[in-house]
Structures are given as structure tokens and as C-alpha cells.
From Swiss-Prot:
Keywords for this protein: Amino-acid biosynthesis, Hydrolase, Magnesium, Metal-binding, Methionine biosynthesis
Similarity section: Belongs to the HAD-like hydrolase superfamily. MasA/MtnC family.
UniProt-recorded Gene Ontology molecular function terms: 2,3-diketo-5-methylthiopentyl-1-phosphate enolase activity; 2-hydroxy-3-keto-5-methylthiopentenyl-1-phosphate phosphatase activity; acireductone synthase activity; magnesium ion binding
Protein name: Enolase-phosphatase E1
Cofactor details (free text): Binds 1 Mg(2+) ion per subunit.
CDD domains: HAD_EP (cd01629)
Cofactor(s) demanded: Mg(2+)
Pathway: Amino-acid biosynthesis; L-methionine biosynthesis via salvage pathway; L-methionine from S-methyl-5-thio-alpha-D-ribose 1-phosphate: step 3/6; Amino-acid biosynthesis; L-methionine biosynthesis via salvage pathway; L-methionine from S-methyl-5-thio-alpha-D-ribose 1-phosphate: step 4/6
Coiled coil: none
Gene Ontology biological process terms in this record: L-methionine salvage from methylthioadenosine
Matching InterPro entries: Enolase-ppase_E1, HAD-like_sf, HAD-SF_hydro_IA, HAD_sf
Name of the coding gene: mtnC
Length: 226
């Protein structure tokens, strides 16, 4: 049957964690107050504000309090959908104004071209919104890579630590589990994908990184799909 599709995690796998933690997250924390004040009546932003109140169990929170909640969630690396949606919108402005370029490991840039030439389908799965993923890959330091991808998945598909999220991906792309390889640096995500029947491979870019019983690679150069 063989592998027909590869699903990649982003942070720590295709993208350096320090870019997320030291560039993108601080940028969103700093930009949130003005962004919410200027866009609070935009339907999408308004929905995110309402969802934040609901999740925080603070239905009467004013805009300043909502901003504080969201900024705290960034610091806690919460995977809340309204936060991830707002971050995607904020980062879109940052990319548009050339505040930063999306960091992509060079070995993935070369590998994604190789996989595409092999007619393998390529998807990304991240706790960051689909829009944020598209921005990352379209404004990457390796150029626009979006045409190499067949799709992207985020928290709307499910929690990355839950088996059901990977079952949902399989249903969406209409492939059997053994036809799909999931690559991530996080053991718990690999366990969830494995429980759904997917093939798995752990990306270990740091020698101090925790590993499990999964096949490991330290670069996409080492990932050969026959």
C-alpha cells in the first residue's frame, strides 16, 4: 500500500521553537490591546472576544479584561481556539509589514520539494490556526511553500493529544491509517496518531529531547519514503 501522505507538526519539527516563543508570541502579546480596540466590531474578532469570555467563565469581562486574559493565555501557551484565531490575524499584519519572516528549517524546505516531486500529499497539523500556518509557509525564509501543501489542520480538527483528531484527519483526506505518516517532536502527539493507526516518526532536533519508542530522525534529510 505504501505511504501516500505526510502530516507534519510545525513548532519543533518544521519550525524552530524559538521563532514561535521569542518572535511570534511576544509580538502578539504586544499587539493585542491595539488590535482588539481597533477591530472589536469585526464579526470574527467579536466572536473571538465572546468565546474568550465563555472559556474564561467571565461573561461580563470588558475589553481590557479580555485582553489581559488573552495575554495570559499566550504566556501559558494555551491552545484556545479564539486566541489562536486572533494570533493568526495579528501575525498576518506583522508578515504584511515585513516585521519578520517565517522560520522554516532548511532540511524541510528541501524535503517538501522532494516529497511533492514524489507525488506525496503533504499536510500540516498545528495548534496554531490554519491561517497562521499558511502565513508561516507563504512568508517563509525559504520563499512561498504553500503550493507544496495539500492542506492544513488546526484545533478545529481536534486536540493534538487526542486520537480522535487523527481519525478526523484520516476521514478528511480519505486515506487509510497505514498510508499516512505523521512527523512530530512531541511524544504525546505521536502516541495519539499511533492510536489512530497512523505511521509515525519523531523529529529529534535537540539531543536533550525526550524520546519514546518511535522511529527517530534529526533532519528531514533522513526521512526517505520509498
Amino acid at each position: 500500500m505504501g505511504i501516500r501522505a505526510i502530516v507534519v507538526d510545525t513548532a519543533g519539527t518544521t519550525t524552530d521553537l524559538t521563532f514561535i516563543q521569542d518572535v511570534l508570541f511576544p509580538y502578539s502579546v504586544k499587539a493585542l490591546p491595539d488590535f482588539l480596540a481597533q477591530n472589536q466590531h469585526n464579526v470574527l474578532v467579536e466572536n473571538c472576544i465572546c468565546d474568550t469570555r465563555d472559556i474564561a467563565l467571565e461573561p461580563d469581562a470588558d475589553l481590557n479584561r479580555v485582553t489581559e486574559i488573552l495575554q495570559q493565555w499566550v504566556r501559558e501557551d494555551r491552545k484556545a481556539t479564539p486566541l489562536k484565531t486572533l494570533q493568526g490575524l495579528i501575525w498576518k499584519q506583522g508578515y504584511a509589514h515585513d516585521e519578520f519572516k517565517g522560520h522554516i528549517f532548511p532540511d524541510f524546505i528541501e524535503a517538501v520539494k522532494r516529497f511533492s516531486a514524489q507525488n506525496l500529499r503533504i499536510y500540516s497539523f498545528s495548534s496554531g490556526s490554519v491561517d497562521a500556518q499558511k502565513l508561516l509557509f507563504s512568508h517563509s525564509d525559504g520563499g512561498d511553500l504553500t503550493e507544496m501543501f495539500n492542506g492544513h489542520f488546526d484545533t478545529r480538527t481536534g486536540n493534538k493529544l487526542d486520537k480522535q483528531a487523527y481519525c478526523n484527519i484520516l476521514n478528511t483526506i480519505s486515506l487509510s491509517p497505514k498510508q499516512v505518516l505523521f512527523v512530530s517532536d512531541v511524544i504525546e502527539e505521536l502516541k495519539a496518531a499511533d492510536a489512530a493507526g497512523m505511521m509515525t516518526c519523531q523529529m529529534v532536533r535537540d539531543s536533550k529531547q525526550r524520546t519514546g519508542d518511535f522511529r527517530t530522525i534529526n533532519s528531514f534529510d533522513k526521512l526517505v519514503i520509498e
